[in-house]
């Protein structure tokens, strides 16, 4: 039976599509534009025109599919238009689950985010964590609200996955860009924080397993390992056989810097690369427990060093990083 995928041209979406094809599945991918359709065709899937904002197009795209993988979403920090995050992540998700039901879909696998957990500072987030009661970023808010929509309207159909920071070959944006800059020595100023990571292949594999073994209406955090920024730098030094020099900013200086850069961006009309919500998120840090997904879905997480080595090797293959031995 054919499955439908939203967000198939994104980093996680492409990994999910690849794993579906390797499993011998027939894949139909939602495509907003001709360029996206070309990417999907090149991957070996059938592109179908549709848009998260167009409910009827989603019904048409999902009709005849038993399963929908809703991977599409907008992940953006320091947004100039926070309403765009709500439109895509909340309203778009509402359209997806409603269209899936109307089209007779039996299972929706929804790619949420570990950010939606909202764990309190200094704690390890798990599926049952109580939200702290305030948001660190517009992105977190949008994903938390989207989960509420899914659980209110399609808990009987939908398995929710909450990936931590997804890293691996194919990603050089967001946290992936920070890892690249740190490896290249172009991130000389850091803040002390911790973060959880899931390997991109583990993330994709978990999506397929969630279709079969996931319980509708339940969350599954995907988190393979957690490390501090100091531990990440040490691991990069070991793999690259080089010294990484960085200065750690105190909290007050980081917050002040975010405010200043954000203010300058408003004056110039440019998109800030750094802002207060980014600093808040970094200073809060994130640690997640991915045990439930591993145990109930049935897979083992990739070790941290393996994920980092594969990521650096991909950077090198793409000409983004010079390393002595990318193997």
Describe the role of every protein-language-model region:
Residues 3-23:
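N-terminal Rossmann NAD(P)H-binding glycine-rich loop of SDR-like oxidoreductase domains
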Residues 35-91, 99:
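NAD(P)H-binding glycine-rich loop region in Rossmannoid oxidoreductase-like domains
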Residues 77, 114-123, 166-172:
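Conserved catalytic-site region of short-chain dehydrogenase/reductase
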Residues 87-139:
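Conserved Rossmann-fold NAD(P)-dependent oxidoreductase catalytic core, especially the SDR/UDP-sugar
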Residues 95, 145, 174, 191-211, ...:
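Substrate-positioning beta->alpha
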Residues 122-161, 165, 187:
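Catalytic helix-loop patch of NAD(P)-dependent Rossmann-fold dehydrogenases
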Residues 157-197:
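NAD(P)-dependent short-chain dehydrogenase/reductase
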Residues 206-273, 290, 303-327:
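Mid/C-terminal beta-alpha module of Rossmann-like enzyme folds, strongest
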